[in-house]
């Protein structure tokens, strides 16, 4: 039976997700509604993608009984309101990362989903790429021996994108791209809470974080480190090393198609890319969509691959790091 999706917001990421859903079998996934704050934009997207319903408000989509799961692709500060709206209406939710601007927001959304017994997942698409799944298998099999250290880098000059440097939109490197580095290290070390976090970094002139390097000490004397930046080009790779070797996700590590394990190079080709995709390897969004359907058809309320407790942990780490270099957002004062 097809999973019936409602798309909240018509920005670039929502556009890609919608296009990718259209490439999947209609017997499994259907986009039944799209909402924007401007009805004409919603109608435009509905026409382009052959979506039956277009709404000029998120409230209307939340009330649509035909929508089974809502995909939230709004700007970071609008995630919480949209998620709460859809949960209150009884819809399951897949929310773009970062789920919230800070950990308090994430905890509120998680509590709401649990109190209503509804499915909620943070759309950390990286986890569902076959290359990431292959890496998890390598780790589970002990191929690398006793783990010692994990390292991730994600940086490119994003200053031409207004949202990326906009303090009011919770811009900056950490929430936009640093989350990919944190989730990688967290995945490697099994979602444990770090014992100690050390941070160095610089702020952008607009008040958001610019370039940040973080060291995370974990139980068992293992550690991870990452650097993220919205002004500097970095290697955009992620690696984990143990007593028997190293594994590395090659660039682009946030949507990986290549994994090197102890010198052996493996490729994981993506499905065909829909036309008009805005982001690199956009076709890879299909993996998380399939996972959501699988979870919902099994009656699950959260994903075992990115559980809600880990979404809370990631938000907690990112907030601590952000505040360590003196970046606070309006949401922190509520």
From Swiss-Prot:
Signal sequence segment: none
Catalytic activity: (1R,2R)-1,2-dihydrobenzene-1,2-diol + NADP(+) = catechol + NADPH + H(+); D-xylose + NADP(+) = D-xylono-1,5-lactone + NADPH + H(+)
Coiled coil (residue ranges): none
Enzyme Commission number(s) from the entry: 1.3.1.20, 1.1.1.179
Keyword Oxidoreductase included in the entry's annotation: yes
Alphabetized UniProt keyword annotations: NADP, Oxidoreductase
Marked site positions, May play an important role in catalytic activity: 180
MF term (GO), any: D-xylose 1-dehydrogenase (NADP+) activity
Claim: Oxidoreductase is one of the keywords in the record: yes
Any one GO BP annotation for this protein: D-xylose catabolic process
Site (May play an important role in coenzyme binding): 71, 79, 97
Enzyme class name: oxidoreductase
Positions of transmembrane segments: none
UniProt site positions, description: May play an important role for the adaptation of the alcohol substrate into the binding site: 176
Subunit structure: Homodimer.
Origin: domain of life: Eukaryota
UniProt family annotation: Belongs to the Gfo/Idh/MocA family.
Protein name (record): Trans-1,2-dihydrobenzene-1,2-diol dehydrogenase
Gene3D superfamilies reported in the protein's UniProt record: Dihydrodipicolinate Reductase, domain 2, NAD(P)-binding Rossmann-like Domain
